[in-house]
A protein has these predicted regions:
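A compositional/biophysical signature of low hydrophobicity enriched in polar/charged and small residues
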Residues: 1-78
Length: 78
């Protein structure tokens, strides 16, 4: 499994709704609310060889009230 993170900017007042939709979809490993330019930080795992760009485009960015995303690819956990 390959881990990666997505920072999500939501439409105003919609952060909790987006977090709940992500949780209901059962595609995220962990979901955190954050301060700063983005509202949520979400950890995902995909199978080796999965196209992360397509996953984010088709599974994450299609959730209503998501305004913007930033994907963070990680190399190694310590």
């Amino acid at each position: 499994m390959v881990p990666f993170f997505v920072q999500i900017k939501c439409h105003l007042g919609k952060s909790y709704e987006v977090a709940n939709k992500l949780a209901d979809a059962e595609i995220a490993s962990e979901i955190y609310s954050t301060a700063g330019d983005f509202d949520l930080l979400v950890k995902f795992y995909v199978e080796d060889g999965t196209d992360i760009g397509h996953f984010v485009n088709e599974k994450v960015q299609t959730i209503p009230d998501i305004q913007d995303t930033r994907t963070i690819i990680t190399f190694k956990a310590f």
